[in-house]
């Protein structure tokens, strides 16, 4: 027992506590990053403007490349009225074996009136033995718009690795002027019913969700989204609620999931942002 406690303490000493807080403002039709707080290994690159001054693109980087047991990442973004930003990541997030400690990522976004934030990260890969807690809280003022997606890979598929040990806790909540309009929770272990059930993840190694909070979705947009098909062996679909549009992918390929969500984004963005989808340049590398 002493050896176990000693090893746990040693790992605790090495864990990262990372925080990145970003503040965006819109002045004279140009969105700029006006404030940044940074602690630990979580940084943002210089803002890019591939679609003009109104929308700035930011790339969130975690230099260590992977997240070990005990690491805690916090990403916060605050958008002032009418600001518009798109945030993404350069590559897949890697969540390593827990070593008796859980790792976490907490996302907190606050959007003022008529602002728009898109959070479109690459996939997260849960290594065998990982113990991970993801939480996302999005607070929207009147007229604010949020679009975000999340893709999880259970095990390193390219190596034939299965997620046979570990734990996942995932929570996402969206509020409009303090009122809860979306509340999604997932608790999974490799042998839990949710991983193999026909109403759960159906035994598939990749699970993805896309959420848009932008008010009532026009019928023609819903129909166009539902006409999009995901390739390969997959289960997918689009659900329209009074204040939320959500899409789900359950399948065997993270690339197919990203492709499916990007095609949905190409249909949705002209509606909620009044501009065509412009791929972040980092996606082409």
UniProtKB/Swiss-Prot annotation:
Sorted alphabetically, which InterPro entries does this protein's record hold?
UreD
Q: Where in the cell is it found?
A: Cytoplasm
Pfam assignment, any one: UreD
Top-level taxonomic group? Bacteria
Keywords for this protein: Chaperone, Cytoplasm, Nickel insertion
Signal peptide range in chain numbering: none
Q: Which GO terms describe its cellular component?
A: cytoplasm
Q: MF terms per GO, please? A: nickel cation binding
Q: Which family does it belong to?
A: Belongs to the UreD family.
Subunit structure of this entry? UreD, UreF and UreG form a complex that acts as a GTP-hydrolysis-dependent molecular chaperone, activating the urease apoprotein by helping to assemble the nickel containing metallocenter of UreC. The UreE protein probably delivers the nickel.
Function text: Required for maturation of urease via the functional incorporation of the urease nickel metallocenter.
Name of the protein this chain belongs to: Urease accessory protein UreD
Q: What is the organism of origin for this protein?
A: Methylobacillus flagellatus (strain ATCC 51484 / DSM 6875 / VKM B-1610 / KT)
Classification of source organism? Bacteria, Pseudomonadati, Pseudomonadota, Betaproteobacteria, Nitrosomonadales
Supply the gene name. Answer: ureD
